[in-house]
Amino acid sequence: MSYHELQHFTLLMTQIGFPRPISIDTFRKPDFFLVAEILHYITTVVAPSNAIAMDIATQEDRVYFITTVVNVLQTTLHLKLDSKKIYAAGPEAVRELRKIVQEVATYIGAAATSTDKGTSSAASVDLTLHSNALCVASSKIVEASTKLLTQLRLHVDDLYQRMQQAMSSQPDAASLSAAVQQRIKNLAAECNTLQEEVTTNKREKAKLEEQITQKKQSITHTMDRLDAIRSTKPPFLAELEALEADLSKLHLEYARKFRSLLFLEGQLRANDVREQQRVIEREKNLRALQENALKEELNNMYGGVDARSSTSHLDDEFVETPMPHVMDMHQPKPVQDFVPSKAAPINTNAEIPDDESYSYSYEEEEEEEQVISSANPMQQARAPETHSNGEKHRGLDELSHKSNENADNEEYSYEYSDIGGEELDPDNIEF
């Protein structure tokens, strides 16, 4: 903003009748209150119907005031204004205000010229009515001015005469000495006061230095205590280390038992699968024994005639229908798929047995196979037909009862082994 623009702005403000005097150096620093006052005055002049309250206490109020005033002036004067520059209230805001003031000055000048033509006669009438009062006031002003001038002349003349008398007269030694003594006393009093101030300052300085030393000593003492606290080992730290050691031991024990539990669960599932397979095989063998016994019984009842192997009934003229085959009369039921049962919970506190106790024996299986093979009528020679059916059923029941007793009394033992045949340690199993 140039000096010429500032001067022109101040002149325009006086021209539109702004009540507050504005200097050229007013806008060297931001003054938001002055800018708000100028905008409020301009809005009252241009748009008196749009009464805007000058509330600029907070930042939100200032922003609202600037935006509303700028919108009113833009719609009224048809100007393009920058609200950010006006809100800054600096030298850049003077250019925006200068645009507004120029339009307002032209507006006021046009309104004044239009009103002067219609009110010239009324103004002359008003002056004639107050002519006597104006004459009295002018006479009073003239009298007061003459009195003031005469008093000033008398005062100046008296002062000049006094100065001439003082310069021409001889000074009195007593009065001079008295004045000098008085001046000396005044200076001595001033020196005493200064000396007292110096002593008080020294005393205060000593007190401050003493306080500073005390603070330094307290700081050093606290630092020593802090170093001692840092150097000493607190008692709870040893307890914490002991608890950490116990926790590590418990964690190792938990990990070992967890690995053992997983291994035993796997062994239990494998044992359940083997047991189910044994039960299925045993049921198959019993079913085969029953079928063979039934077949033998039927063959004995019908005289050993087999519809598929023998064709003598075709040549027999007395046989009307062929005899049904034994296997067609009794078909075996289909075996259902095996579904392993859910593993039972394991006691984790139980000790894991040694490797020596895990040994699998095949003697009982061999005995069972021998019993089944000995009881199978297909592999042995046919019994004589004189045996009764009651004896055959009794032998079949004894075989089934014996096989069930063997299954109940079986004790299974397994060895820990990997796929390659190597023994496994339950504590060193990796999952």
From Swiss-Prot:
Keywords carried by this UniProt record: Cell projection, Cilium, Cilium biogenesis/degradation, Coiled coil, Cytoplasm, Cytoskeleton, Flagellum
Bias-annotated ranges (Acidic residues): 352-370, 420-431
Coiled coil spans: 177-218
Biased composition (Basic and acidic residues): 384-405
Pfam families: Cluap1 (PF10234)
Keyword Coiled coil annotated: yes
GO CC annotation: 9+2 motile cilium; axoneme; ciliary basal body; ciliary pocket collar; ciliary tip; cilium; intraciliary transport particle B; microtubule organizing center
Localization per record: Cell projection, Cilium, Flagellum; Cytoplasm, Cytoskeleton, Flagellum axoneme; Cytoplasm, Cytoskeleton, Flagellum basal body
Region (Disordered), start-end ranges: 346-431
Any one Gene Ontology BP term: intraciliary anterograde transport
Record InterPro entries: Clusterin-associated_protein-1 (IPR019366)
Similarity section: Belongs to the CLUAP1 family.
Function: Component of the intraflagellar transport complex B (IFT-B) involved in flagellar assembly.
Name of this chain's protein: Intraflagellar transport protein 38
Organism per entry: Giardia intestinalis (strain ATCC 50803 / WB clone C6)
Lineage, uppermost ranks: Eukaryota, Metamonada, Diplomonadida, Hexamitidae, Giardiinae
